[in-house]
């Protein structure tokens, strides 16, 4: 969870022909005061691409723009333990954040602290950090095992093997296969039910005609 990944890595990864997108996120837990109580927040940075993807999960408010009146606009993520809403303010040690939007989902694990999402520039201004804790990579061809191995080697060599490399492609393939198999079973079941219903109707008509 430490911010140790140089942003140059994102540029190097995006330069590879097999890579569709590469993007990083910074992370920092911060003490904060909000809704009249002392607590903490999990501050996470998004770049432009991630904010574009977040639009579909926006359930209220807008995406963050530039800071106004000395306050930094941020998003938060809806959760049963997070009661922050649009318009709420979060007071840090020497800065104030304003919630301008709420997401109904995020790729982060739920914690006891509210997830607060800001721009990379805001993150840098608030924490002084500009390295990433996580870099995500999307491939143009998810079956390109050679490309995956090349990326793995690049990251391991660059970071002196001090990196956790997680390949979610195989897991996503299994999820997708399970999804289609489930749909196939459901549709087959519906077809059988429809066939039985039609046969019952035909039998009822035949019995009615025979009774006459």
Regions found by a protein language model. Give the residues of each.
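Short conserved AdoMet
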Residues: 14-17, 156, 160
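Structural beta->alpha junctions
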Residues: 102-106, 137-144, 168-172
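A short beta-strand structural signal in non-transmembrane regions
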Residues: 129-154
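Peri-transmembrane interface segments
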Residues: 150-152, 158-198, 207-212
